[in-house]
Amino acid sequence: MSRGIIIIGSGFAARQLVKNIRKQDAHVPLTLIAADSMDEYNKPDLSHVISQSQRADDLNRQLAGEFAEQFNLRLFPHTWVADIDADAHVVKSQDKQWQYDKLVLATGAAAFVPPIAGRELMLTLNSQQEYRACETQLRDAQRVLIVGGGLIGSELAMDLCRAGKTVTLMDNAASLLASLMPPEVSSRLQHHLTDMGVHLLLKSQLQKLEKTEAGIRATLVSQHSIEVDAVIAATGLRPETALARRAGVAVNRGVCVDSYLQTSHPDIYAIGDCAEINGQVLPFLQPIQLSAMYLAKNLLGGNAPLKLPAMLVKVKTPELPLHLAGETQRSDLSWQITAESDGMIAKGMSGEGQLRAFVVSEDRMKEAFALLKTLSV
């Protein structure tokens, strides 16, 4: 008798995988185990909850019970997986255990909180649960410090500013989105945030946080300090690899998988923010959707290697939206930038004259798909 497929996790990757499996097989036993409620919500919406005046429960799209009924699943919410016995094909929690034929790790990634004095005062917004824990503080806060000027930090800074808050955005780098693109490309967003009233503290590092009568004092390495009501850590994500490590599965930055999404153990797979696919961690929606399509086939007996095309990454900054694609972080590209009142096109060219990356903003985003077709990958 088939012991079926167990998926650990209940986020976007897990749900996409369930839907793709059920398109091909209505009856294979499917079990999901996760530490949260398993209710569905749209995680990217967390970047806009404050300006939209949304509470955590407003984000719900589908309750866990409805999901289980729709896709014929066994669900175990609020359940921590303690261990995996890979040789025996057994998943263990504190008081239960489940046998499997195939196991999928969809454990996601955790928000990184800088290891400074007072780090417990920092808020994170990487899940509905985390937002629920701090929504009152964030709603009431007038002065907010965001640590980290990457994708999430920039999105949150714009959102909080639109909500009428006094926002300071801090980063070690000399420009925003520094790990994604050069300063001459990100400067348009940087200027726009400044014009909106966001105070930028670039080339700055946080040293400590202290609770005061007036709120929180944030002290920089430079000894400059500011008083705020809330501090948000937007300093990146770390793939959740502890469970894979305990199971004896190879990990690096993420859980190491090949083009078949298979780990170093033949019956254990990984998908989503926790997975490192052939050396790359790709925590974006499109690669996760494609991974789910291919992994569903492979779990049901197929042998289909994942092929990822050139893909768009969308920066959700509504007053100055950006799309980017290709190797935008490469330092050896020559950038051709056309900036006009209706938007910007920035093309990253190789020494051989090939288009290797691009960034488009505002009304010029409509040119993204044509550029995508000419991108060298």
Swiss-Prot record:
Catalytic activity field: 2 reduced [nitric oxide reductase rubredoxin domain] + NAD(+) + H(+) = 2 oxidized [nitric oxide reductase rubredoxin domain] + NADH
One protein family per Pfam: Pyr_redox_2
Name listed for the protein in its UniProt record: Nitric oxide reductase FlRd-NAD(+) reductase
Annotated GO CC locations: cytoplasm
First-listed, main subcellular location of the protein, grouped into a coarse class: cytoplasm
Entry keyword set: Cytoplasm, FAD, Flavoprotein, NAD, Oxidoreductase
Organism phylogeny: Bacteria, Pseudomonadati, Pseudomonadota, Gammaproteobacteria, Enterobacterales
Primary enzyme class: oxidoreductase
Enzyme Commission (EC) number: 1.18.1.-
Gene that encodes it: norW
Organism: Salmonella gallinarum (strain 287/91 / NCTC 13346)
Record-linked HAMAP family: NorW
Requisite cofactors: FAD
Subcellular location: Cytoplasm
GO MF annotations in UniProt: oxidoreductase activity, acting on iron-sulfur proteins as donors, NAD or NADP as acceptor
Family: Belongs to the FAD-dependent oxidoreductase family.
Keyword Oxidoreductase: yes
Function: One of at least two accessory proteins for anaerobic nitric oxide (NO) reductase. Reduces the rubredoxin moiety of NO reductase.
Gene3D superfamilies: 3.30.390.120, FAD/NAD(P)-binding domain (3.50.50.60)
Pathway(s) annotated for this protein in UniProt: Nitrogen metabolism; nitric oxide reduction
